From Swiss-Prot:
The keyword Ribosomal protein applies. It comes from the Eukaryota. Its main location: cytoplasm. It is found in: Cytoplasm. InterPro entries: NA-bd_OB-fold, Ribosomal_eS28, Ribosomal_eS28_CS. GO terms for cellular component: cytosolic small ribosomal subunit. Gene3D superfamilies: Nucleic acid-binding proteins. Component of the small ribosomal subunit. Mature ribosomes consist of a small (40S) and a large (60S) subunit. The 40S subunit contains about 32 different proteins and 1 molecule of RNA (18S). The 60S subunit contains 45 different proteins and 3 molecules of RNA (25S, 5.8S and 5S). Belongs to the eukaryotic ribosomal protein eS28 family. It holds the Pfam family Ribosomal_S28e. GO terms for molecular function: structural constituent of ribosome. This is Small ribosomal subunit protein eS28.
Length: 67
């Protein structure tokens, strides 16, 4: 991460489930700290739980829902 790359802070409001071939990715719903009315679904690699703050390098793309 360099100084030129803008990051967006988002708070995990709900853990939706595990995905990936071995369950190594967690699907979460996040709410942006700058705009609390805006929420999206993202895939997160590694340990994550509710109320964690994520630094999103890219904040426009939304993950597909679990089946």
């Amino acid at each position: 991460m360099d100084a030129k790359t803008p990051v967006t802070l988002a708070k995990v409001i709900k853990v939706l489930g595990r995905t990936g071939s071995r369950g190594g990715v967690t699907q979460v719903r996040v709410e942006f700290l700058e705009d609390a009315s805006r929420t999206i679904v993202r895939n997160v690699k590694g340990p994550v739980r509710e109320n964690d703050i994520l630094c999103l390098m890219e904040s426009e793309r939304e993950a597909r829902r679990l089946r």
